[in-house]
Amino acid sequence: MATFPCQLCGKTFLTLEKFTIHNYSHSRERPYKCVQPDCGKAFVSRYKLMRHMATHSPQKSHQCAHCEKTFNRKDHLKNHLQTHDPNKMAFGCEECGKKYNTMLGYKRHLALHAASSGDLTCGVCALELGSTEVLLDHLKAHAEEKPPSGTKEKKHQCDHCERCFYTRKDVRRHLVVHTGCKDFLCQFCAQRFGRKDHLTRHTKKTHSQELMKESLQTGDLLSTFHTISPSFQLKAAALPPFPLGASAQNGLASSLPAEVHSLTLSPPEQAAQPMQPLPESLASLHPSVSPGSPPPPLPNHKYNTTSTSYSPLASLPLKADTKGFCNISLFEDLPLQEPQSPQKLNPGFDLAKGNAGKVNLPKELPADAVNLTIPASLDLSPLLGFWQLPPPATQNTFGNSTLALGPGESLPHRLSCLGQQQQEPPLAMGTVSLGQLPLPPIPHVFSAGTGSAILPHFHHAFR
């Protein structure tokens, strides 16, 4: 790769343009002059001329946050901020007492004192120069020396100026400085910029109040936050998942917003139809069962009701006390089975007002209550064999009367007599009395004697 060394100072440059600009520092030539009538400054490169033209602009977009002083250029503001730095290192001149914030400014100031006394030697490299201006430019070159090898080097140099960049992309972005193409216009001050990031930075720092006022008028406040501070973002937090049907007793229903309370869940299309509410009479007897709750599952039957042997018992209620078949007075202590209404009971019965769940039996028994016609040809010993009855006694009370069956008398005749002698009413389950129950035939195998009616054990049927 061809290099261009300087014959005067020994510096080497990679491009011809950089070498030419460097030669201007030796020849004191300034080809780029300011066009302002009152300014006669000239510069060695186009870039430095354009940077100087910003000082003639009435718009000072760079403002100090400490003293509100404004500047045309950003580097001027940066140099000014060092005056407000409490940790700054001040370089004071021993001859005149003037202080500088940078080493370069301090050395240049010392070079002026040395040049006034006739000494044009560089204090850094001990190079002797011809004039004071050359000495100042030489001191500036020392400040622009290459950084240490540990840092990243700027290898990509601009073809139009002496600036170097880390990547070629930075070089292409820098080219707008040389082309002068400014396609980005500020909507507040009509200032134009060659790069979009420069316009964004200018808008945030200079017209932040105008942006806020415009956003308040249009109602678009969210876009203002993104424009002013891209790192600040508004994030909408979703509500935590919460069951809509939560009870108010847990103290969480009050914390839900009003929109959640107003939500209603529509049932699915294939959902089952809701259960019919219970009657008021059953709901009063069972307050724990809500009207909308499904009924509890029914218990399985102990016996197969489809069998022909037990088909007459299919319409009867489930298992009750077997001893009550022989003594009707035992049913006085049994609870009722959820009557739908007290008016549906048999007229011969009425609920006791003092004791809920008991039946007051009338003193007079209807004559047709136990007038049953039971054929004596059917054998119900398999059905009655599982009953455990007390041993035979000489006298057994059936209600308040005594029933005596002889060996030669038939059961229907004795049951008819029982209806005339019995003073206690028959058992009623719901609205069905004992005379209306479809009881199966009862065998007439009874032991002889003058005692009460004794139902036999299973082995008595084979005697």
From Swiss-Prot:
Under the heading PROSITE patterns, the entry gives: ZINC_FINGER_C2H2_1 (PS00028), ZINC_FINGER_C2H2_2 (PS50157)
Gene Ontology biological process: apoptotic process; negative regulation of transcription by RNA polymerase II; positive regulation of transcription by RNA polymerase II; regulation of cell cycle; regulation of cytokine production; regulation of immune system process
Q: Which domain of life is it from?
A: Eukaryota
Name where it's found.
Nucleus
Instruction: Check the UniProt entry and state the signal peptide residues, or none.
Output: none
Give the matching SUPFAM superfamilies.
beta-beta-alpha zinc fingers (SSF57667)
Q: What's one GO-annotated cellular component?
A: Golgi apparatus
Concerning InterPro entries, the annotation shows: Znf_C2H2_sf (IPR036236), Znf_C2H2_type (IPR013087)
GO MF annotation, one:
DNA-binding transcription activator activity, RNA polymerase II-specific
What keywords does the record list, in alphabetical order? Activator, Diabetes mellitus, DNA-binding, Metal-binding, Nucleus, Repeat, Transcription, Transcription regulation, Zinc, Zinc-finger
- Tell me the Pfam families matching this sequence: zf-C2H2
Q: Where are the zinc fingers (C2H2-type)?
A: 4-26, 32-56, 62-84, 91-113, 120-142, 156-178, 184-207
Region of interest called Disordered, as start-end residue ranges on this chain: 268-306
Q: Which family does it belong to?
A: Belongs to the krueppel C2H2-type zinc-finger protein family.
Q: Which disease is it linked to?
A: Diabetes mellitus, transient neonatal, 1: An autosomal dominant form of diabetes mellitus defined by the onset of mild-to-severe hyperglycemia within the first month of life. In about half of the neonates, diabetes is transient and resolves at a median age of 3 months, whereas the rest have a permanent form of diabetes.
Complex and partners: Interacts with THRSP.
Q: What does this protein do?
A: Acts as a transcriptional activator. Involved in the transcriptional regulation of type 1 receptor for pituitary adenylate cyclase-activating polypeptide.
Q: List the protein's name.
A: Zinc finger protein PLAGL1
- List the lineage, top down: Eukaryota, Metazoa, Chordata, Craniata, Vertebrata
